[in-house]
């Protein structure tokens, strides 16, 4: 088997979004799974729209999710002389030509074609022009598209695709200022980089016949193509920023783990048996572009949150502390190692993101300022207050390093007073945490410690 070489080639006109990252992941997995090469190419030939910040954000996103590319990043803006050389080659071989049609003439032609209910297109009028070029017109360069031929390629996702060359006009490969067009620079770079397989969004499917014309004109080897359907929202519409089509780094800021995001995106448009959870190693072992789906996939926040919660639960306390560094939350320095482990173990089971985990740390470690009203109103204060006073005395005798002892102390009150567990547990929870839900009470007592627990109960009794 020949060496698999893939690439990801974004334009730095905006930040890397979720669909782009998925394309990068597919190309990365295919190359790495076959001990091949994976390159990053920045398609920055549109000098008026390029953004250095956007290019850097793409690189930053790659670093975050762990997509390592081979060699140096290739910037197309540094390769204009190479493209110029290949355009001249086509001109010299009479496979391309200068077109002197002005914009006004082209607009007028299109209006005439529309009036005749024809598809607007250039009419190839300068294809075999031998006369004197009109003055004052900076020409574009057009490729001579072979006529009366059928372009056939077998797309790895779409199947066999056929296009008659008569449906294509002689499209532009160099603008009047000499800069090359997208379709031209793509095929030159893919050929010179030795790209064997192109996995990209199916919005590029219509470009492929034109690119094949150029591959053939320059006698370049045509790569294999895989055109992946776009990602839709849960209503079946094009993904918007509100539904997930946002800067990849926003997901890091929201507290998603890179492992969860890669797993989630790899499964959007690709499947392997009924398996949902994949480590990077498992993805490398299982991924094959032949298994890419031909139908659009749907972005699901519920699914992403479920996956993220799974990966969150599998992090150790030390790993979580490292991951939590970008987020602000209560000081943890007063907790001993056992309390810290217990805090993170208890809360990671109840959190879907790192951001949510940070908020829950605050909720536990910050003494309640007020108490959940609907729970407080239901309390029988005449019964509750004596119970908490008695429990305070019991806590002074308990070893707070022993969760079982803390649990026994609570059950002792319930048994001695012959009351239902909720009659005591609910007010105790309110006193410690300020609300009716949250982590277990023995965990809360253990994490808070004797001094803080007694302080919170005393404050509640005075409220």
UniProtKB/Swiss-Prot annotation:
It catalyses: tRNA(Glu) + L-glutamate + ATP = L-glutamyl-tRNA(Glu) + AMP + diphosphate. InterPro entries: aa-tRNA-synth_I_cd-bd (IPR045462), aa-tRNA-synth_I_codon-bd_sub2 (IPR020751), aa-tRNA-synth_I_CS (IPR001412), aa_tRNA-synth_I_cd-bd_sf (IPR008925), Glu-tRNA-ligase_bac/mito (IPR004527), Glu/Gln-tRNA-synth (IPR000924), Glu/Gln-tRNA-synth_Ib_cat-dom (IPR020058), GluQ/Sye (IPR049940). It comes from the Bacteria. ATP binds at residue 241. GO terms for cellular component: cytosol. It is an enzyme of class 6 (ligase). GO terms for molecular function: ATP binding; glutamate-tRNA ligase activity; tRNA binding; zinc ion binding. A motif ('KMSKS' region) lies at residues 238-242. One of its GO terms (biological process) is glutamyl-tRNA aminoacylation. Keywords: Aminoacyl-tRNA synthetase, ATP-binding, Cytoplasm, Ligase, Nucleotide-binding, Protein biosynthesis. Its EC number is 6.1.1.17. The keyword Cytoplasm applies. It is found in: Cytoplasm. A motif ('HIGH' region) lies at residues 10-20. NCBIfam families: gltX_bact, PRK05710.1-3. Monomer. Catalyzes the attachment of glutamate to tRNA(Glu) in a two-step reaction: glutamate is first activated by ATP to form Glu-AMP and then transferred to the acceptor end of tRNA(Glu). Belongs to the class-I aminoacyl-tRNA synthetase family. Glutamate--tRNA ligase type 1 subfamily. This is Glutamate--tRNA ligase 1.
């Amino acid at each position: 088997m020949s060496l698999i070489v893939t690439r990801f080639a974004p334009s730095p006109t905006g930040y890397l979004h979720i669909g782009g990252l998925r394309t990068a992941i597919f190309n990365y997995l295919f190359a790495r799974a076959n001990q091949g090469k994976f390159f990053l190419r920045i398609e920055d030939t549109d000098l008026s729209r390029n953004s250095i910040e956007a290019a850097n954000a793409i690189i930053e996103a790659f670093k975050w999710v762990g997509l390592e590319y081979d060699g140096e990043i290739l910037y197309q803006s540094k390769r204009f002389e190479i493209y110029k050389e290949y355009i001249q080659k086509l001109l010299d071989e009479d496979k391309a030509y200068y077109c002197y049609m002005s914009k006004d003439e082209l607009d007028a032609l299109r209006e005439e074609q529309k009036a005749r209910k024809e598809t607007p297109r250039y009419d190839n009028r300068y294809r075999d022009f031998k006369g004197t070029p009109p003055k004052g017109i900076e020409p574009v360069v057009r490729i001579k598209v072979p006529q009366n031929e059928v372009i056939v390629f077998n797309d790895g996702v779409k199947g066999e695709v056929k296009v008659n060359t008569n449906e294509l006009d002689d499209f532009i490969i160099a603008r009047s200022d000499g800069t090359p067009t997208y379709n031209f620079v793509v095929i030159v770079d893919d050929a010179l980089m030795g790209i064997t397989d192109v996995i990209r969004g199916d919005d590029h499917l219509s470009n492929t016949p034109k690119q094949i014309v150029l591959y053939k004109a320059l006698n370049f080897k045509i790569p294999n193509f895989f055109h992946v359907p776009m990602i839709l929202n849960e209503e079946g519409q094009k993904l918007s920023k509100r539904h997930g089509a946002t800067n990849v780094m926003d997901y890091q800021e929201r507290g998603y783990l890179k492992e969860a995001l890669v797993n989630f995106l790899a499964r959007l448009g690709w499947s392997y048996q009924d398996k949902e959870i994949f480590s990077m190693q498992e993805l490398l072992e299982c991924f094959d572009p032949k298994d890419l789906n031909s139908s659009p996939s749907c972005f699901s926040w519920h699914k992403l949150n479920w996956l993220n919660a799974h990966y969150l639960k599998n992090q150790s306390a030390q790993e979580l502390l490292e991951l939590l560094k970008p987020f602000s939350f209560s000081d943890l320095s007063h907790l001993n190692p056992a309390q810290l482990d217990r805090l993170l173990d208890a809360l990671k089971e109840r959190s879907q993101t790192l951001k949510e985990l940070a908020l829950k740390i605050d909720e536990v470690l910050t003494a309640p300022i007020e108490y959940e009203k609907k729970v407080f109103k239901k309390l029988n204060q005449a019964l509750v207050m004596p119970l908490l006073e008695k429990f305070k005395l019991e806590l002074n005798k308990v070893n707070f390093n022993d969760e079982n002892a803390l649990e026994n102390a609570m059950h002792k009150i319930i048994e001695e007073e012959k009351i239902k567990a909720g009659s005591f547990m609910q007010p105790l929870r309110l006193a410690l945490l300020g609300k009716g839900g949250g982590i277990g009470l023995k965990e809360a007592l253990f994490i808070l410690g004797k001094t803080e627990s007694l302080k919170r109960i005393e404050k509640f009794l005075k409220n």
